[in-house]
């Protein structure tokens, strides 16, 4: 079924306001506690239990339906081919700008999906783990392009997701530290074959070079967390200043000088310069254009609360 736009054109999307979306929760129970939510929230992220109930429980219910339908389709194909029953992970991509709250969204989904009655094994992987080390970025002269498409080891990321999708028992991937602002030498994250794999990052919906596979080609469902650019900018600044008062105090922090040597005004100027020259440019040029590729878009208001949801039905 398609819906008509205000201009009368048919569209494969349906857009729901917050109340209409919240009603789709049906009888899905809220089993998350405030203490558990506190551990899942990102720095300066105000996501509340009301937000979980109204937005993420309906999303959990929808994903449950998607997973069941996808498993049935995969089983039918295996039966047709006469292959043994070797389930492959249901892969979810979570995209959006820096500071928009996509990491909190991904962690919430991991927790909520793992609480389904059949208790699926859910793994969460950030594409930050596939950033090139700072030494490589410096050598290539693109340290100021960190977060842009060319700063990621795209081949390694594609190989990881494709092998997981193919049913690999386990894989080791690098580990990125936001404290060190770099890949940690010698440290790895071991990903055991999950029932559901969530891949979170600013670049997960980006199109491939001509003739190549896109990461999104391996997704069964994709989600884009959206907000107005000026709101994201404000959230980014608030988060940076909160980190200055907390994580940056750690001597191991890459930005330790922001907490010890810079005034608050200097820290604000640094954050805004970084936003305008790196994050906003990347958002406008590389991230926002991928939004139409998402299965579902969460539109946030200035207070971080989701105001409306757009779902692609085909």
UniProtKB/Swiss-Prot annotation:
The keyword Membrane is assigned to this record: no
One Gene Ontology term of the molecular function aspect: ATP binding
GO CC terms: cytoplasm
Domain of life: Bacteria
Cellular compartment(s): Cytoplasm
A GO BP annotation: coenzyme A biosynthetic process
Listed EC numbers: 2.7.1.33
Catalytic activity: (R)-pantothenate + ATP = (R)-4'-phosphopantothenate + ADP + H(+)
Chain residues that bind ATP: 96-103
Keyword hit for Hydrolase: no
Pathways involved: Cofactor biosynthesis; coenzyme A biosynthesis; CoA from (R)-pantothenate: step 1/5
Keywords: ATP-binding, Coenzyme A biosynthesis, Cytoplasm, Kinase, Nucleotide-binding, Transferase
InterPro entries for this protein: P-loop_NTPase (IPR027417), PanK (IPR004566), PRK/URK (IPR006083)
Similarity comment text for this entry: Belongs to the prokaryotic pantothenate kinase family.
Record protein name field: Pantothenate kinase
